[in-house]
Regions:
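Active-site glycine-centered loops adjacent to acidic/histidine catalytic or metal-binding residues
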Residues: 11, 52-53, 82-83, 161, ...
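Active-site-proximal beta-strand elements of phosphoester/diester hydrolases
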Residues: 3-16, 117-127, 157-159, 214-221, ...
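A short C-terminal boundary segment appended to hydrolase-like catalytic domains
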Residues: 2, 243-283
Length: 283
């Protein structure tokens, strides 16, 4: 089996204009900078995977900016639906590489694709707005997962926006997980011998969890971070966190995840308020 390499990025949070800012940073310049860095890498990845929150508010203007920025990539890009996205909008506005949809309706974004014999599955855990920011896998999505997560088959990698298992951070565990994440984890167990990893975003923090032989791996946001400490009852904007993406190698005998943090962009810093604070977590 030949190696496969990909870029994992997440939580770009495009706004309606390039001037849009969140947590004290303008997201558009960072996304553009990430694309430039990916195109300059000394190793050409096979694809880019964006695990959701392409936008902050799913407007045509925000998706148009995202489409324009990511069209400059030299390799195909794929998307998962974040809690700030809608699956229908991603279908409508964003171009992806070759894939096979797992469900025919445009209200769900779930699909598979294959690269050099490696199997990739994207799950849609975007639930109803009433449970936001938590996720939920529908019965249909659990059926898709169980059909893919069998003991035998090619190397398998899973992508979704939300974490499925506990992060040992009180607020995150109460508010950010997939409601039926334990059911998802149990569904994955038959495939753990060929499962290369479950990659997600949502938490704006580089985090790895290893449970029952399964690697769960989150990537930092491309522009703004959250704290996830085990003694926090409420998360905060992490102004010490660096923006980043991950360079992932799927080798015959191992999975390598290399975090690629990069320096803050002076031109992307948003003005602070008179009291010295930056925008809140949802601005």
């Amino acid at each position: 089996m030949l190696p496969v390499t990909f870029i994992h990025l997440s939580d770009t949070h495009f706004g309606p204009t390039p001037e849009y800012a969140r947590q004290g940073h303008r997201s558009h310049p960072y996304a553009r900078h990430v694309v430039e860095m990916i195109n300059r890498l000394p190793v050409r990845p096979d694809f880019v995977m964006h695990t959701g929150d392409v936008t902050t508010h799913p407007t045509p203007a925000a998706y148009a900016l995202a489409a324009e920025v990511f069209a400059a990539l030299d390799v195909p890009i794929y998307y998962a639906t974040g809690n700030h996205d809608t699956s229908a909008d991603i279908h409508r506005y964003l171009t992806m590489g070759p894939k096979e949809d797992c469900q025919p309706d445009k209200g769900t974004l779930s699909y598979t694709f294959t690269v050099r014999g490696h199997r990739f599955l994207v799950l849609d855990a975007r639930g109803p707005d009433a449970i936001d920011p938590r996720g939920l896998l529908s019965p249909q999505q659990l059926d898709v997962l169980r059909a893919e997560a069998t003991p035998d088959g090619p190397p398998l990698t899973i992508f979704t926006h939300y974490p499925a298992v506990r992060l040992n951070s009180p607020w995150m565990d109460a508010n950010m997980l997939i409601y039926n994440g334990e059911e998802m984890h149990q569904a994955l167990l038959p495939a753990r011998g060929r499962l290369r990893g479950v990659f997600f975003g949502h938490i704006h923090n580089s985090t790895q969890i290893f449970r029952d032989g399964i690697l769960y791996c989150a990537v930092a946001s491309t522009f703004a971070g959250f704290t996830t400490w085990p003694n926090e009852e409420m998360i905060k904007a992490d102004h010490d966190a660096m923006p980043a993406f991950n360079f992932v190698q799927l080798l015959p005998e191992q999975t390598i995840v290399q975090q690629r943090p990069f320096a803050r962009l002076a031109e992307a810093t948003a003005p602070r308020r008179a009291d010295g604070s930056s925008r809140n977590l949802e601005d």
